[in-house]
């Protein structure tokens, strides 16, 4: 829980740039608002006067995790993890008539504002693992995973100009006589995942891994919510071969490895497949001879029911080298990543007839592809290892 007040950041800048003339305080010890009339400046300390500028934020935050782990059979392990996060925040702001703070655009002091937000998220993950060995030399590891998460965010804000009761700050917005406006927002997303992984090792020298994920998200349209992402890798620990026995006194590890896998990106969580609208209230009317307060709805984002997952196809070939019982370790990798169906927020052409309020509208689309490849080197050394002193180095290129 936090409860804090924010000072007007322009106080110090104004104090340095204002003319060094006049008195900050009057004879009674009060803030002298127009301390330098010739300079046309108000006192840079005006916001320090009682009820002239208030910016108070109260927040509560909670996070918790719990898990259950069972081993019903030898080699069989089940673990369930549940985590949650809750947060609430209230930010109240008041600008008095003498405030020098940068007031919210479109308003004049006195002005009272309140911003409220609340969010929660939880994630539930279950992992079932079974490790076993056949005929002494064949080791297997099988893992199954399910995961579910949900996130919800909501917010609202209120503005009231003409709140003359400075002593009541932002606690009485109903006293505002002009430009009383409200706004709110809400979003909710959910995701579900299933995963399977198989590990195989023969005598600890020949290694194989295969996995696949099935991920689904709520913010993509039907037919595009789910996709699968397979991966496979192989490894050969050459240093464990019998023909390498003569090198064991200085070569502690030599391993070749290669892998290929697909990863996915579902983009932002703002329902790219569905269109949204915004709203605005004109306190003095929308024009055309109508002076009464008016309310309009306008286009926000344009939904695309065909937008889907962005996919990256990754290839990696590498070698691990360990010398002198692990005192020197070198890893070298060559990688190549092809990313296809890039998610991009594209500006719609004016000729489409689709436009947001005051600007062209944008829509998420899958378009284009990229390629990223290169070589990566990593060197780790244990230079000095003593009982009370250790010096190590790590260099990556």
Identify the residue ranges that each predicted region occupies.
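Extracellular/periplasmic, surface-exposed regions of secreted and cell-surface proteins
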Residues: 1-13, 36-95, 106-397
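Acidic, Ser/Thr-rich peripheral helices and adjacent loops at domain boundaries
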Residues: 12-17, 21
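Intrinsic-disorder/low-complexity loop/linker signature
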Residues: 18, 29-30, 277-278
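Outer-membrane beta-barrel biogenesis signature
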Residues: 26-35, 247
């Amino acid at each position: 829980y936090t409860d804090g007040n924010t000072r007007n950041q322009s106080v110090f800048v104004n104090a340095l740039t204002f003319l060094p003339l006049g008195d900050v305080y009057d004879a009674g010890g009060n803030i002298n608002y127009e301390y330098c009339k010739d300079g046309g400046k108000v006192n840079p300390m005006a916001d320090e006067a009682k009820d002239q500028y208030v910016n108070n934020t109260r927040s509560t935050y909670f996070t918790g995790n719990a898990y259950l782990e069972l081993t019903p059979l030898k080699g069989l392990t089940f673990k369930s993890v549940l985590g949650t996060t809750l947060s609430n925040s209230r930010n109240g702001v008041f600008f008095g008539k003498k405030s020098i703070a940068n007031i919210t655009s479109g308003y004049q002091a006195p002005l009272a504002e309140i911003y409220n937000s609340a969010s929660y998220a939880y994630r539930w993950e279950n992992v079932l693992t079974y490790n076993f060995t056949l005929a002494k030399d064949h080791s297997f590891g099988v893992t199954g995973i399910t995961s579910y998460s949900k996130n919800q965010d909501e917010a609202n804000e209120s503005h009231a100009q003409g709140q003359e009761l400075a002593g009541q700050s932002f606690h009485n917005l109903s006293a505002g006589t002009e430009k009383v406006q409200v706004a709110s927002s809400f979003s909710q997303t959910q995701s579900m995942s299933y995963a399977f992984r198989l590990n195989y090792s023969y005598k600890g020298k020949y290694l194989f891994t295969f996995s696949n994920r099935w991920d689904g998200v709520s913010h993509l349209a039907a037919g595009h919510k789910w996709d699968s992402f397979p991966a496979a890798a192989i490894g050969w620990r050459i240093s464990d071969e019998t023909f390498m026995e003569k090198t064991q006194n200085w070569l502690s590890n030599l391993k070749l490895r290669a892998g290929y896998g697909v990863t996915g990106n579902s983009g932002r969580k703002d329902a790219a497949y569905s269109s949204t609208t915004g709203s605005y209230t004109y306190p003095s009317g929308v024009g055309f001879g109508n002076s009464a307060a008016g309310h309009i709805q306008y286009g926000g984002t344009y939904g695309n029911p065909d937008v889907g997952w962005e996919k990256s196809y990754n290839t990696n070939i590498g070698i691990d080298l360990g010398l002198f019982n692990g005192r020197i370790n070198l890893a070298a990798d060559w990688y190549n990543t092809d990313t296809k169906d890039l998610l991009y927020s594209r500006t719609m052409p004016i000729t489409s007839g689709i436009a947001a309020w005051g600007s062209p509208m944008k829509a998420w689309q899958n378009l284009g592809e990229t390629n990223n490849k290169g070589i990566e080197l990593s060197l780790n050394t244990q230079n000095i290892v003593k009982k009370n002193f250790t010096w190590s180095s790590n260099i990556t290129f």
